Structures are given as C-alpha cells and as structure tokens.
Amino acid sequence: MLITSNAKTQLEDTLAKMAEAAELDKTRWSRLNTAYEAISKWLSDDPEFFGGVEIEIYPQGSVSIGTTTKPYGKTEFDLDVVIHIKLLSSNYDPKTIFNEVVRRLNENETYRKICEPKSRCVRLNYQGDFHLDVVPGCMVIIYNHELIDITDQKNEIWLRSSPKGYQKWFLDIANRVELTLLEMTFSAHKVEIEEYAKKKPLQRAVQLIKMRRNIYFDQNPENAPTSIILTTLAAQFYEGQSSISETFEGIISKLKNHIETLFPNRPFELPNPVNPSENLADIWVDKPELYKHFISFINNLHNEWQDLKKAHGIEEEAILMKGMFGNDPYIKAMEARAETVNQKRGNGLGILATGVMVDRAVEKSLPVMPNTFYGD
C-alpha cells in the first residue's frame, strides 16, 4: 500500500483497498473454481441425458468482469455461473433442459442438500462461502460460442443471452486506460506494483457504486437497482480516466445530468450492449417506483461524493467514507496502511510529518508530492 502526503493519491489508494476488501478473495476464488469444475464433471458423467454431450461452464456477471462485492452485512457472495450445454436450443424446450439439470444435481447427495431451483437458475448454497446460481443454457447457432439461450422454466421460454459478449464489451471499455494512477505512482516511487493497484478504475468504481447501493438499500433491498443496470451505465458513461476518483465522479455526475436533462419523470430504456433488443431496465416499466428510488440513490451518491471532496482532516474523511462504503472495508484499508508503515519502519524507513519517507541506512530521502486534493 502507498504511504504519501498527496491527498489525491492517498484517497485513490484508500478507495482501491476498500474495494479490494469487499471483493472475492483468493481462497474463495479457488473454492469457486473447484465448485464449478466439479459440477461440470458431474453433469458430463450423467449416464442418462448429458453423457457424451459437450458442456462448458464459466462465470458470468461480476465474477467474469472483476467487480465482485460482498453483500452488506453478510458473509456469502452471490455468484453466477453458466452451464453452456452444446445442444441446439431449437431441438429442446427450456423446461426439459432445466429439469434434467435439476434431476442430475439431485442425484448427488452433496448437491441435493444445497440445491434450490429458481425460475432461471439452480441455486447451490455453499454455507459461509457463496450462493452459486447455476444458469443452464443451450447453443443458438452451431460454432457460435458466445450466444446462448438460457432457460426460463417458469414461463417455459428461451431467453437470448451472451455472457461472454458482455464480458468482452465491459473489459474492452475498462482497458482503455493502460496504466492506472496507482500503477504510475508505484512506478514513480520505484516500488513494485502491488496487485490491488492493477485493477482498472472502471472496475473499482463499479465495485464502490455497488457497495454504496448495498448499504443505501440495506433496509429495503427490493428497491435497489440491479447490478447489471449500474454496471452497464457505469461503462457507458466512463471516459477512460486513469484514477478511481475521477472515474467515480465522472460516472455519477454524467448519470445525474442524464437523468435531470432527459428523464426526470419517466424511466429510460437501457438496451443490452450485446443484445440491443433486450431492455436491461425493463423492471422500471413494470414498477416505475423503482426508477424513483434509483434517482434518489444517484442524487444521494452525488451529494455524498461532493461532501467527501470538501472533507477537512482525516477524521471527517473517515466518517464520510465509512458511511458511504462500510465500516469493515475502511478498517481493513487502514489496517493495510498501518502494516505498510510498520514494514517500512522495520526496513529502516521513517516517515516524517512532512510526508517524506527517509532511508536512514543510506541517509537518503524520497520526497512526496505536495498535498493536493482531487477537485480542489
């Protein structure tokens, strides 16, 4: 973690560490990979329906684009994986495919205990780790490995989707910036770039927006905007900024202006960027009150960010950041900072009140840039 008196860089570092604290950790990543590989093997070994059928299983949603966030006040993550069954959807009805997946999972004693069929997925509840929503689907066209028809067994229809296409669309936008502000700062200080600093500003901004969403709607989660709405809008309003703070502010400010200028009283459509015929915000048509909650959330988020920019001193900034993004992520970010300071001191480095890090062994000092805060 970076230690600097530059307020903009220090804020950037704190935001990144807070987002990292709320994301899927390496241990659960490993368990997730093990879980969906086991599911794939169990289906493929089916002697009745799936035996001999090619099955590809892969993550979708936040897992695939690097924007996972733990639900507020809970220990389990909500994660999605796709079971891409290489059978043409035109040859089967969705209910048959869905029921065969449920049937096969229930033949396994472990899965039977944690299996919960939903409308479009089968949820596997891995206690203390994550809820894994397994989404079955079939090929639309032979040799097209992105397009998929997923099952909606409740309405007995196929729903066109492209999880891989959406992943590519989002990551192409996120990767418009080659080096993040944190990467450049690490390099300027001739320090090895830590992994948390390499995640793109758009990914971090989406994580932070969802973290604030989870807290804001904690008492009424049914009113919260979906992650796909927030993620898609964030990517559409992103302009390639290299810092998390500029990305966050740019997205929220542009979105607020978009609403006030064009859609103050009625919901707007949000076409799926990889399937334009699908309106990702169709729920606002059926439940317009949810759009009002969305507007209130964006306005509140904008106002809170402006307050954070005007914060005077560490204590005020801490109160605002914990209120926006959660107490635990902030504490973990500060613990990481304290650990870094202790390591530097143990290596013979001292940090002066001026923000200069001193190497006492060779009596050299590394100056830190003047104190400037983003937006001032």
Swiss-Prot record:
A Gene Ontology biological process term: defense response to virus
EC number(s) on file: 2.7.7.65
CDD domains the UniProt entry points to: NT_2-5OAS_ClassI-CCAase
Molecular functions per Gene Ontology: diguanylate cyclase activity; GTP binding
UniProt keyword annotations, A-Z: Antiviral defense, GTP-binding, Nucleotide-binding, Nucleotidyltransferase, Transferase
Top-rank taxon, per record: Bacteria
Role noted for this protein: Cyclic nucleotide synthase (second messenger synthase) of a CBASS antivirus system. CBASS (cyclic oligonucleotide-based antiphage signaling system) provides immunity against bacteriophage. The CD-NTase protein synthesizes cyclic nucleotides in response to infection; these serve as specific second messenger signals. The signals activate a diverse range of effectors, leading to bacterial cell death and thus abortive phage infection. A type I-D CBASS(GG) system. Cyclic dinucleotide synthase that catalyzes the synthesis of c-di-GMP, has no activity with other NTP substrates.
Misc. remarks from the entry: Bacteria with this enzyme do not have other c-di-GMP synthase enzymes (no GGDEF or EAL-domain containing proteins), suggesting this second messenger has been co-opted for CBASS signaling via STING activation.
Similarity comment: family membership: Belongs to the CD-NTase family. G05 subfamily.
Protein name, UniProt field: c-di-GMP synthase
